[in-house]
Swiss-Prot record:
It is an enzyme of class 2 (transferase). Belongs to the SUA5 family. TsaC subfamily. One of its GO terms (molecular function) is ATP binding. The gene is tsaC. Required for the formation of a threonylcarbamoyl group on adenosine at position 37 (t(6)A37) in tRNAs that read codons beginning with adenine. Catalyzes the conversion of L-threonine, HCO(3)(-)/CO(2) and ATP to give threonylcarbamoyl-AMP (TC-AMP) as the acyladenylate intermediate, with the release of diphosphate. Keywords: ATP-binding, Cytoplasm, Nucleotide-binding, Nucleotidyltransferase, Transferase, tRNA processing. It is found in: Cytoplasm. It catalyses: L-threonine + hydrogencarbonate + ATP = L-threonylcarbamoyladenylate + diphosphate + H2O. Residues 3-188 form the YrdC-like domain. This is Threonylcarbamoyl-AMP synthase. It comes from the Bacteria.
Amino acid sequence: MLQLHPSDIKDVVLNGGVIAYPTEAVYGLGCDPDNDTAIQKLLAVKQRPWQKGLILVASEFSQLLAYVDESQLTDEQLELAFSKWPGPFTFVMPIKPHVSRYLCGEFDSIAVRVSAHEGVRALCQALGKPLVSTSANLAGEDPALSGDEILNVFEGKIDALVLGQLGEQRQPSTIIDARSGKILRNGQ
């Protein structure tokens, strides 16, 4: 497994690799959201059913416009998300028709977040697009909090480990349905 700085990870991700990287609270697993083979590999590594869907994390909202159908949201609904970003808030938003079922699962929506974590932002900026994001753990297990934990669980199963520090957050992000404003998961 390669151990790389965020600026060196672009080729791994764009060539279908699955990576582990530090986020606001825990290590995440990620891949290219436009590569179904990479998404399927990530789901298999994590032992996560595709039906649950995944999160996209971005450095800015404009990176999410290829996936989110903002025409189905009012200015007020968008403003709620913009008022919380960048930060530990994930919003469930309507999807565009072409979005992979592996990303949205059985839903007509997708979970998206604009991160405040400098390492995550650097990854997304280097890629020029969002990154699939899910906690780095096997389904039902605790997420990894260190590079050593990543190596213990995922050695030989993922393509690279991004070096960096976790953020200060100790809880997962709050998840809000952008259409209804309903809190689906209380986080931080």
